[in-house]
């Protein structure tokens, strides 16, 4: 099961008592800020959670799995996420009891 933006908005509604429309807008705004920063080439650091980084990948050789034909995989920029130590610790602790 995955946590969705709708569930995040519902949690804000229940916890903070704000109306559902405002809660949904807050969640959307949060993610739009992250998207905008990454589109501008900025790193996103969320203290206690982790970092979103941009990484440039060079062109490399690849292969079409159906035909076996060699094809180039074009250069691109990708987003990576590195969890912070607090997040790692909490995930490991919650997984230890299972």
Swiss-Prot record:
Gene3D superfamilies: IHF-like DNA-binding proteins (4.10.520.10)
Alphabetically ordered keywords of this record: DNA recombination, DNA-binding, Transcription, Transcription regulation, Translation regulation
Any GO BP annotation: regulation of DNA-templated transcription
Disulfide topology: none
Keyword Phosphoprotein (UniProt): no
One GO molecular-function entry: DNA binding
Ligase in keyword set: no
CDD domains: IHF_A (cd13835)
Record-linked InterPro entries: Hist_DNA-bd (IPR000119), Histone-like_DNA-bd_CS (IPR020816), IHF-like_DNA-bd_dom_sf (IPR010992), IHF_alpha (IPR005684)
SMART domains with a match to the protein in the record: BHL
PROSITE patterns xref list: HISTONE_LIKE
A GO term from the CC aspect: cytosol
Region of interest (Disordered), residue spans: 49-71
Function recorded in the entry: This protein is one of the two subunits of integration host factor, a specific DNA-binding protein that functions in genetic recombination as well as in transcriptional and translational control.
Subunit note: Heterodimer of an alpha and a beta chain.
NCBIfam families with a match to the protein in the record: himA, PRK00285.1
Homology family: Belongs to the bacterial histone-like protein family.
Protein's UniProt name: Integration host factor subunit alpha
């Amino acid at each position: 099961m995955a946590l969705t933006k709708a569930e995040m908005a519902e949690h804000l509604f229940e916890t903070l008592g704000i109306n559902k429309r405002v809660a949904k807008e807050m969640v959307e705004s949060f993610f739009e800020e992250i998207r905008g920063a990454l589109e501008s080439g900025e790193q996103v650091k969320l203290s206690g959670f982790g970092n979103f980084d941009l990484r440039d990948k060079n062109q490399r050789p690849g292969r079409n799995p159906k035909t076996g034909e060699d094809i180039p995989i074009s250069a691109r920029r990708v987003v990576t996420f590195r969890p912070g130590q607090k997040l790692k610790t909490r995930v490991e602790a919650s997984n230890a009891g299972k």
